[in-house]
Amino acid sequence: SIDGLGASLGLPDFERRDADVMIWQYRLAACVTDFYLYLNGDDYVVTGWAWRPPFVGQSMDEERCEQQIGNLLDANA
């Protein structure tokens, strides 16, 4: 749920809403991670996610990205 995502990772760095879909974006040094949330009844639920390098044409260190996401989880635990 959107509440669970916010409790786990904190508020996003960027948020976009279109009709019944919302994207929460977290911008980390190693990657940018987007979570896709769709309206299901009265709540938004996470239905998918994607990550990419912070800059176009740059390679991404997936292990470092995972570590930074883990750090966000730890900080909000």
Locate each region found by the language model.
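Residues within mature, well-folded domains
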Residues: S1-A77
